[in-house]
Design a protein with these regions (language model features):
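Long, contiguous all-alpha helical interaction modules
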Residues: 1-184, 378-605
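Domain-exit/linker segments immediately C-terminal to small folded modules
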Residues: 260-448, 453
Length: 605
């Protein structure tokens, strides 16, 4: 039992579990020598002693990381507000009443419904006392006085007095039932349907009088108890191998009383993965050997501690799997930098990653290598349970260097956005806001060009009555230049002695040319609305890659004012990307915004 257990970095999901396991054990386990990080061999070593009271460390980690953002944490924050309110004896107004009522609703809902499953675990009479106090709490109204508020606050504080009573197990470990009830929602982002998240099965057992214990015991029974037995087990007759750690496992049998079957664990609880007990037609010769050891099973239970979760279960894990130090440092750096105001600021994510890699590159601490960014978004319902759907981006060496080379222009899009306006009130609908830095980076990571983003940005600028935005024509020109470089990177078009690529100067020349064309066109037509019609027709031709239509519209419009088209448009006939780049540059110039300095440049034909 004293021999250390070794686990190597593997696939992204197991790596997320390993990182979660390290996070849960914390620096104390490293300092004591019970947990060792071996970067050279990409593995960790840990003593079985770390499993003592592991269930408490497990939940304490989540409480520390997310507690303040969840219901019980917010109720405790409200208690601070109550104390300050009493001290300051604030005067009442409608705004204060509405703010307090929101908190009152939260408190009543939590203690009358959400936390009811906890009450049977507490001292006799606890539930009756809490529900009696909760029933007395009423929302405030216009006639409410300071005295009414203080009476309400006294009731809330009385509830919290009950809840904050310390409860310990026989070993002196503190139990945090209310926090755990909230934390279950975070853990559910990573896995579902077993242990303390198998709500229906636990309820049935309790109804039958079976003592399943509290959440701590349920976790230990599910994930730790079998490890202790497995480590003591004589494995000489075991013939199967764990698909992850390659450790020995017993062969599966149809005998339900086989005591060794408890060591055969599956990972179906993590999501839409293969269920070994069903669909044996999916495996060779109808014989399933896809099992993991109890130790690996425990690591997979730590997956939610490896991800960084924000609002509505949006999660992030960076699978920088060169070594454990890099994996741990990069993910924890991202957490501390983007987890602010109780929400993950997604717009900051990639900027932080690139900055960290740039610093590492400068310090020559790590060789730059491909890394995988794993994200969770919506959920998938399977047999009444909700599992995460994962999305993957690869940050290759090629992409990372491209980002470093273009960091100045890319960073100029940070905090740039567009948002649609409400049709009736003309107020921005901020839940629809698109942040350009994130959109641009993700498009590049998916190895796509940026034409659709450029097109959308042009449409936004052309539709002032529908959108609000904070970018201009110069930003669009920068994006066209980034796009040219990105396309040449993707297609390997950089050739010594080959045709010279379009430059930012070419793009700016066309934009400026369009700016002066616009002025002359409006002067000739005496109707500014005509330019809008021209913008939409040109955009349509660009969207459909119709060079002939675009050139017909362009030549006709120039002929109308007696002006020749710019000589650079000859290149539009030879190359689709140059056509779209020059076409959008001209469209941007027609938008009549951006920095007007040096607009004389490019006015020549």
């Amino acid at each position: 039992m004293d021999e250390k257990i070794e686990l190597k970095l593997k696939d992204w999901l197991f790596n997320a579990g390993l990182l979660g396991f390290i996070n849960i054990l914390g620096e104390e386990a490293k300092s004591s020598g019970e947990l060792e990080i071996d970067n050279k061999n990409r593995l960790i070593k840990f003593s079985p002693k770390v499993l003592e009271n592991f269930e408490y460390k497990y939940f304490d980690f989540f409480i520390k990381r997310y507690g303040k953002t969840l219901t019980y944490g917010k109720i405790l924050e409200f208690e601070k507000y109550i104390d300050e309110f009493e001290e300051n004896d604030n005067s009442l107004n409608q705004e204060i009443i509405e703010a307090i009522n929101k908190k009152i609703v939260m408190v009543k809902k939590a203690f009358s419904k959400k936390y009811k499953t906890i009450y049977p675990l507490l001292e006799k009479g606890f539930e009756d006392n809490i529900l009696e106090l909760e029933e007395k709490i009423k929302k405030l109204n216009k006639k409410s006085t300071i005295k009414d508020i203080k009476n309400t606050f006294d009731l809330i504080k009385e509830i919290l007095k009950y809840c904050k009573q310390d409860i310990y197990d026989e070993k002196g470990n503190k139990k945090k039932y209310f926090e755990i009830e909230d934390i279950k929602n975070i853990i559910r982002y990573g896995w579902e349907g077993i242990a303390f998240l198998d709500i229906a099965n636990l309820a049935i057992k309790r109804k039958k009088g079976i003592d399943v214990g509290d959440t701590y015991k349920v976790y230990r029974d599910f994930f730790i108890k079998d490890i202790e037995d497995y480590l003591k087990e004589d494995k000489k007759d075991f013939k199967l191998r764990c698909i992850n750690s390659n450790e020995l496992l017993p062969l599966p049998t149809k005998n339900k009383d086989d005591r060794n079957s408890k060591y055969l664990k599956t990972i179906q609880f993590l999501g839409d993965f293969f269920n070994p007990s069903k669909k044996l037609s999916n495996v060779w010769n109808f014989y399933n050997d896809i099992y993991v050891t109890p130790i690996v099973y425990l690591i997979y239970s730590c997956v939610p501690a490896g991800f960084i979760y924000g609002k509505n279960g949006k999660g992030i894990f960076i699978n920088a799997n060169d070594n454990m130090e890099k994996l741990e440092k990069l993910n924890n750096t991202v957490f501390y930098n983007i987890f602010e105001k109780e929400q993950v600021n997604e717009n900051k994510l990639y900027k932080i990653i690139f900055r960290e890699f740039e610093l590492q590159n400068q310090e020559k601490r790590y060789e730059i290598s491909d890394i995988q960014v794993v994200r969770t978004f919506e959920r998938k319902e399977l047999q009444g349970k909700s599992y995460p759907i994962y999305k993957f981006n690869i940050l290759s060496k090629n992409i990372l260097f491209f980002m470093f080379q273009n960091s100045e222009k890319l960073n100029s899009f940070f905090e740039k956005y567009y948002v649609s306006l409400d049709n009736d009130t003309n107020i921005p609908k901020w839940d629809t806001a698109e942040y350009l830095y994130k959109v641009i980076i993700e498009t590049i990571l998916e190895s796509r060009n940026l034409y659709s983003t450029i097109d959308k940005m042009c449409y936004v600028r052309m539709s002032n009555e529908k959108y609000r935005c904070n970018f201009n024509g110069n930003n669009l020109c920068d994006l066209l230049e980034i796009n040219i470089k990105n396309i040449r990177r993707l297609e390997g078009m950089e050739k010594a002695g080959g045709e010279v690529a379009l430059t930012l100067k070419n793009i700016t020349d066309i934009k400026n040319n369009a700016y002066y064309f616009r002025k002359e066109y409006i002067e000739k037509s005496k109707n500014e609305n005509k330019i809008k019609g021209l913008q939409y027709r040109l955009q349509n031709a660009l969207r459909t890659n119709n060079v002939n239509l675009f050139m017909d519209i362009l030549i006709t419009a120039h002929a109308y004012i007696g002006k020749e088209i710019h000589k650079l448009f000859i290149r539009a006939l030879e190359n689709e990307d140059e056509f779209k780049t020059l076409g959008y540059a001209f469209l941007i110039g027609l938008l009549n915004d951006g920095n007007k300095e040096n607009q004389n440049e490019g006015n020549e034909q």
